[in-house]
């Protein structure tokens, strides 16, 4: 439950603006000043840490939910039931260190990436249309796994005009070794309308020559 709540909170950047503060000051209406210190020591002593919260009770003992972001990847470490305060921070630090050393966020594809190939168009104002990816894909992978990735594109032999930009015309399968791990739409990069009257007339003449 703590992990699920932490992951949801991490989606809201405003939270990290406050949770990442190590020291802050409150000025009361009376003018009295209260100094605040973040109980999450990792905010100060762990690079990239910007949340979340500590807690302790007699039953739960010392606990912490900590998060850090590096190289575009955010990790969350939840530690419960430690015998003393420092151990919860040590355990959380070890978990974060392991995660950042072992995994990486990889941008496999970006929306709008051109495929470098075209698809034949029947009875259109152009004979073919360029293709691009209709969506992007980022994944968390173990370090070194990128060499096992490949993308296979499945397309029909041709499509009929009219074709509109963004129209789905095929599928790109992302494979890790031989296992499909994701599917992306392949879309038309531009419009291919039906030929106009004059162009259509000349095409008919060409067919009869």
What kind of feature is each model-predicted range?
Residues 1-209:
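Domain-terminus/edge residues, biased toward the C-terminal soluble/receptor-binding domains
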